[in-house]
Amino acid sequence: MNIVILAAGMGKRMHSDLPKVLHPVAGRPMLAHVIDTARTLSPSRLVVVIGHGAERVREAVAADDVTFAEQDQQLGTGHAVMQALPQLDDNQPTLVLYGDVPLTTAATLKALVEAAGNTRFGVLTVEMPDPTGYGRIVRDAAGSIVRIVEQKDASEAVRAIREINTGIIVCPTGHLRRWLATLRNDNAQGEYYLTDTVERAATEGIDIVSAQPAALWETLGVNSKVQLAEVERIHQRNLAQRLLETGVTLADPARIDVRGELTCGRDVSIDIGCVFEGRVHLGDGVQIGANCVIRNSSIDAGAQVQPFCHIDSAKIGADGRIGPYARLRPGTELGEDVHIGNFVEVKNSQVAAHSKANHLAYVGDATVGARVNIGAGTITCNYDGANKFRTVIEDDVFIGSDTQLVAPVTVRRGATIGAGTTLTKEAPADKLTLSRAKQMTLDAWQRPVKKAKQ
């Protein structure tokens, strides 16, 4: 099968420099969603017709199985498909999709393709309560489709028809090539309509069939930021529904955003306002508190993430305790039962089982052993202005509050670092290491009297 995706439009009503088809739905370009759905049909040719912002569109969705055709002037849908003709195989039917209609399901497209087979003309239609602005499906007395009439060219009688054309069609490619060559632009829009091929097919006695989607939202197009927001909410609602059906507890299905792929084990609970980006896995019994942002991370069974945490490209071991207000940056790997508390940031560090940094700390470019306690205010000083250096903290270390570990430095097994220490050399195993000024009290000192300047 050939699949042609029309993605050349400017999208004036978006009021944006970004090409319309690159505006995101669930964190990915609309066009990427359409391409993903098209791939489920295993096409032999997948052609994207580009125009406005062509290079940006090409870069955004380039892949080995995608080819491009350029429409230099936007002269209508028929003209757009003409640009793809040199890349199509006449021995296979062609399915036409739209880069700004991102929610059409694979099941709906398969139903249309199966209805059309290799010899019929298939049209995806829907009935709308208010069909204003859409091309109407005109049928004869026997119920067969004879033509599609665009809104601006329709009579009052035709405008009363509620069945509309979604624009998605499939037909034999050889016929399509011939019909496109006969299109005229003598209409209210001055464009070459792809829909006019329906009338050509009817005139030649080609059987015209239709299929309908399971839901109206599958065919919603995006021409404005208002419509983009509507499509986003529908998509998120559908994703939330699937999570609920697999046993995930959502505090409010209307207040979760999944911008990628979220997989969950059993008895997972997600509070309100959470955003999941990229690939995220939540193991059995994981609890996610309110207003967390989690990106490209895995969280193992039994872990708890308290509210307002940011987790990016990290691995959290079983039974971990994160937050609230914690930040895990790329390269963070936490073992079993690791506690990372409020206002603690961990970056590019490996922390072994049962270790804790519960308050106000920065752990960057570090290797932390098991059963380590990192006191409040501890900082790994990992950057000298040009290069990053690692800190190594071995098992069973206790680090007192307000400690600076100036990398590269190692704290050996079982060592204790006194509060307020600035550590610049290796701390030996099982010993107390500290560096601080000797405390003094000046008995004769009096606080000076200070007067405000007049």
UniProtKB/Swiss-Prot annotation:
Q: Which SUPFAM superfamilies match?
A: Nucleotide-diphospho-sugar transferases, Trimeric LpxA-like enzymes
Assembly, in brief, is: Homotrimer.
Cite the binding residues for Mg(2+).
D100, N223
Indicate what this protein is called per its UniProt record: Bifunctional protein GlmU
UniProt-recorded Gene Ontology molecular function terms: glucosamine-1-phosphate N-acetyltransferase activity; magnesium ion binding; UDP-N-acetylglucosamine diphosphorylase activity
Query: What's its catalytic activity?
Result: alpha-D-glucosamine 1-phosphate + acetyl-CoA = N-acetyl-alpha-D-glucosamine 1-phosphate + CoA + H(+); N-acetyl-alpha-D-glucosamine 1-phosphate + UTP + H(+) = UDP-N-acetyl-alpha-D-glucosamine + diphosphate
Catalytic EC class: transferase
Give the span(s) annotated as Linker.
226-246
Residues at the active site: H359 (proton acceptor)
Source taxon at top rank = Bacteria
Enzyme Commission no: 2.7.7.23, 2.3.1.157
Pathway it acts in? Nucleotide-sugar biosynthesis; UDP-N-acetyl-alpha-D-glucosamine biosynthesis; N-acetyl-alpha-D-glucosamine 1-phosphate from alpha-D-glucosamine 6-phosphate (route II): step 2/2; Nucleotide-sugar biosynthesis; UDP-N-acetyl-alpha-D-glucosamine biosynthesis; UDP-N-acetyl-alpha-D-glucosamine from N-acetyl-alpha-D-glucosamine 1-phosphate: step 1/1; Bacterial outer membrane biogenesis; LPS lipid A biosynthesis
Which InterPro entries does UniProt cross-reference here? Bifunctional_GlmU, GlmU-like, GlmU_C_LbH, Hexapep, MobA-like_NTP_Trfase, Nucleotide-diphossugar_trans, Trimer_LpxA-like_sf
Q: Which residues pair up as cystines?
A: none
Q: Cofactor note, please?
A: Binds 1 Mg(2+) ion per subunit.
Main localization category: cytoplasm
Q: State the organism of origin.
A: Cupriavidus pinatubonensis (strain JMP 134 / LMG 1197)
One GO CC term on file: cytoplasm
Residues reported in the UniProt entry to bind UDP-N-acetyl-alpha-D-glucosamine: 6-9, 20, 71, 76-77, 98-100, 135, 150, 165, 223, 329, 347, 362, 373
Map out region (N-acetyltransferase) in residue numbers: 247-454
